[in-house]
Amino acid sequence: MMDTAIATIRAREILDSRGRPTVEAEVELECGIVGLAQVPSGASTGSFEAHELRDGDPKRYGGKGVLSAVENIETRILSALVDLNALDQTVIDQCLLELDGSENKSNLGANAILAVSLATAKAAAEYLGQPLYRYLGGPLANVLPVPMMNVINGGAHAANNIDFQEFMIMPIGAPSFREGLRWGAEVFAALSKVLADKGLLTGVGDEGGFAPNLDSNQAALDILLQAIETAGYRPGTDVALALDVAANEFYEDGKYVFDNTSRTASELIRYYDQLVSTYPIISIEDGLQEEDWDNWALLTETLGSRIQLVGDDLFVTNPKRLQRGIDNGVANAILIKLNQIGSLTETLQTIDLATRKGYRAVISHRSGETEDTTIADLAVATRAGQIKTGSLCRSERVAKYNRLLRIEAELGDQAVYAPKVGLGPR
C-alpha cells in the first residue's frame, strides 16, 4: 500500500464562532500523516449555495446539529475514499461529487464533502513537506492579499439598525501585508475611540466589527473617514472603503427598503453612484438582489469602470452562475467561499474561470467561523489579491491574519503585497 493512500477518516461535531455546530474532519494516510479541516457556516446565505446538512432534531442545538454529516463521513465517504491516493485531489473530489449525486450536495451535505476535501489536501501537503499555499499554488504563490477589514457590522451580522451588512477598510497604500495589517488595527482602535466619544456602543458583531446604532448607512461612512484620519492615514490614498450591501436582506416585493425608504433598482444604483462620488469607496458587494440580473447589468454599466462590483449571493462561488454573469456583463469580481460550492477542486476551477475572464476573486470567510486558516493559504495560492476575514478582533478572524503574517515572513523577499502589483481591487 502506498504511503499516500487514505487509511481512515474521522469526523466530529464541533462549535463555530457563534456557538453552533459545524463539521471537523481528519484524513489519515497510510504513512500516519493526518490532515485536519473545519468548515464554516454563513448567516446571510444565497439561495443557490450548496446544501449544508443539519440534523433537524429540535432536542439538539435547536435542530442545528451535524451528526448526520459526521456519520456520512465516517461511513459512506470513508468507504468510497479508502485506499485512494490523497495526492490526486481532483479524483478525490470527483469521487465525492459522484457519491453524493445531487446538484447541490444535499445527500452527503456540502459541510461533510468540504471537510473531507480540505483535510485531504492538508494531508497531501504535509506528506510533501510543503505549506498548503505552495502545494495548491506552486512556485508562483507569493502574493499577499490586501485585507478587506469589516470594522462596522450591520444587517444580518449584528443586532443594530444599520441596513448594509459590512463597512470595510482596505489598507491599499501600505508597502506590505504586515504594515497593512498594522494600519488596519490602528484605524480599528481609532474607530473604537471615535464611537466611544460619540456615546455609541462598542460591542462587536459576528465578524468582530463594531455594531453601533446609527442614523443612516452614510453616518457609518462618515465615522469611518473620521477614524482613518484620527489614526493618521489619508482616506482613499492610504486606506480605502468597501461595502457589502447584502441587498438580498432588504429586498421586498421588487423594491429595496433601507434607511426607512423604499427604492427601485434604478434609484438604488443612483444612490450608489452618489456614494462613490462622495466617499473613497472602491468596492461594493451584492449591491442588488441575487436574481435581479437585468439591473445588475445596469449597475455594472454605471459603476463597473470605476469600482469593483463583487457578486457573492449573486454567484455563490458557482462556475455556472459566474459564466452567466460573464456572458451578460454582470459584476466584475466574485466572492469565493469554499462552503458555497462545497469542494476544493470546484473552488479552484471557479477562481480559474474568473481569472481567465478578467474578473477579480476575493477569498472570503463566513460569519460563523472556526480556527481553521485554509482561506489564508488559498488567497496566496491563487494570487487572488484580496481577502475578507473580518475585523481586527475575535480570534477566529485574527487567526487568518496571523497565518498570512507567517506566510509573508516565510516567503521573505519573494513576498509581494497585492496592491503593489495591480492585484488588489480594480
From Swiss-Prot:
SUPFAM superfamilies: Enolase C-terminal domain-like, Enolase N-terminal domain-like. It is found in: Cytoplasm; Secreted; Cell surface. Its main location: cytoplasm. Binds a second Mg(2+) ion via substrate during catalysis. Its EC number is 4.2.1.11. SMART domains: Enolase_C, Enolase_N. This is Enolase. One of its GO terms (biological process) is glycolytic process. PANTHER family: ENOLASE. Pathway: Carbohydrate degradation; glycolysis; pyruvate from D-glyceraldehyde 3-phosphate: step 4/5. Belongs to the enolase family. Its cofactor is Mg(2+). PROSITE patterns: ENOLASE. InterPro entries: Enolase (IPR000941), Enolase-like_C_sf (IPR036849), Enolase-like_N (IPR029017), Enolase_C (IPR020810), Enolase_CS (IPR020809), Enolase_N (IPR020811). It comes from Thermosynechococcus vestitus (strain NIES-2133 / IAM M-273 / BP-1). Catalyzes the reversible conversion of 2-phosphoglycerate (2-PG) into phosphoenolpyruvate (PEP). It is essential for the degradation of carbohydrates via glycolysis. It holds the Pfam family Enolase_C. It comes from the Bacteria. Keywords: Cytoplasm, Glycolysis, Lyase, Magnesium, Metal-binding, Secreted. It catalyses: (2R)-2-phosphoglycerate = phosphoenolpyruvate + H2O. One of its GO terms (molecular function) is magnesium ion binding. The lineage of its organism: Bacteria, Bacillati, Cyanobacteriota, Cyanophyceae, Acaryochloridales. The active site is at 207 (proton donor), 337 (proton acceptor). (2R)-2-phosphoglycerate binds at residues 165, 337, 366-367, 388. The gene is eno. One of its GO terms (cellular component) is extracellular region. Mg(2+) binds at residues 244, 285, 312.
